[in-house]
Regions:
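Conserved acidic carboxylate
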Residues: 8-10
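Acidic, metal-coordinating helix/loop segments flanking the phosphotransfer/catalytic sites
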Residues: 32-50
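Acidic catalytic/metal-coordinating carboxylates
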Residues: 35, 61-65
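Active-site residues of response regulator receiver
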Residues: 54-56, 83
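Short amphipathic alpha-helix used as the core "switch/output" element in two-component signaling
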Residues: 64-76
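Short, flexible helix-to-coil linker/hinge segments that flank and couple to helix-turn-helix
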Residues: 91-95, 99-145, 202-203
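Recognition helix of helix-turn-helix DNA-binding domains
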Residues: 159-192
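Basic, Lys/Arg-enriched C-terminal extension of HTH/homeodomain DNA-binding domains
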Residues: 182-217
Length: 217
C-alpha cells in the first residue's frame, strides 16, 4: 500500500482527492493537512510515499518551499503538485524544487489518477501549457512575458516604482505595459486588472500568514 498525504486548504478539493484515492485499493490515506509546514513535520515521523501538494496553502511556507524541503529530507518521496494556479513561473519553480509531476485541480478523475499512477511508476508528468483564462476581453496566453511579469507584481500589490526596481526596467516602460494591458483587457484601471487576475488564479498572491497551522486534521 502506498501511503499518501494530501496537503490542501480548500475543503472541497481536499475531500474530492480523499474520495478519489480512497476508492483505489493500493493507496492508503493518512490524515490530510492544510498547511505546508505541518506536512513537512508530519513526513519526518511518518513513512509517506506520495504527497499531493497544493501551492497556495496555509502555514509558514508555500507548497513549493515545502516540496524542496521534503525532497532534501526524503529524496525518494513522490510529490505531485495539484493546483488551480496557472502562473507559468510558479510551475517552473515547482519543477525546480523537485516536484515529480504537476497537474491541475480541474482535471477529470481519470486524468488525475493517471498522473498519480504514472508518477508512482517513475514517470514525470507536466502540462505542456498553462490553461488560458479570460482577463476582461483578453486571453492570458495573448499577454507578452513582460506584461505577465508586470501583472504578477500588480497582483502582489507592488507600485509602479517597486515593479520598475524589481524587474530592472524604467518606470516609463512599466506604465507603457500597464497601458497596453488595460487596452487589451478593456478594464478601467490597475486595481481591476489585479482583481480579475487574482480571481482567475493567474498568479500566486505572495501573502503569508504570521503563524503556521497548529492542528493536523
Amino acid at each position: 500500500m502506498t501511503k499518501v498525504l494530501i496537503v490542501e486548504d480548500q475543503r472541497i478539493h481536499r475531500e474530492y482527492m480523499e474520495t478519489l484515492l480512497s476508492q483505489e485499493g493500493h493507496y492508503e490515506l493518512i490524515p490530510s493537512v492544510t498547511a505546508a509546514d505541518v506536512a513537512v513535520q508530519l513526513c519526518k515521523t511518518n513513512p509517506v510515499q506520495l504527497v499531493l501538494m497544493d501551492i497556495a496553502v496555509n502555514g509558514m511556507m508555500d507548497g513549493i518551499e515545502a516540496t524542496a524541503k521534503l525532497k532534501d529530507m526524503s529524496p525518494n518521496i513522490k510529490i505531485i503538485i495539484v493546483t488551480s494556479m496557472l502562473d507559468t513561473e510558479c510551475l517552473v519553480n515547482a519543477k525546480e524544487a523537485g516536484a515529480d509531476s504537476i497537474w491541475y485541480k480541474d482535471a477529470s478523475e481519470e486524468a488525475l489518477m493517471d498522473v498519480i499512477d504514472r508518477t508512482m511508476q517513475g514517470e514525470h508528468i507536466f502540462p505542456d501549457n498553462s490553461p488560458a483564462v479570460h482577463i476582461g476581453f483578453a486571453r492570458s496566453d495573448k499577454f507578452t512575458k513582460t506584461e505577465c511579469d508586470i501583472l504578477r507584481e500588480i497582483v502582489n500589490g507592488l507600485s509602479s516604482r517597486q515593479i520598475s526596481e524589481k524587474l530592472d526596467i524604467s518606470g516609463r516602460t512599466v506604465d507603457w505595459h500597464i497601458k497596453n494591458l488595460l487596452e487589451k483587457t478593456g478594464l478601467p484601471n490597475r486595481t481591476a486588472l489585479a482583481i480579475r487576475a487574482a480571481k482567475g488564479n493567474l498568479f500566486v498572491i505572495k501573502d503569508k500568514p504570521e503563524q503556521g497551522e497548529k492542528n493536523i486534521k
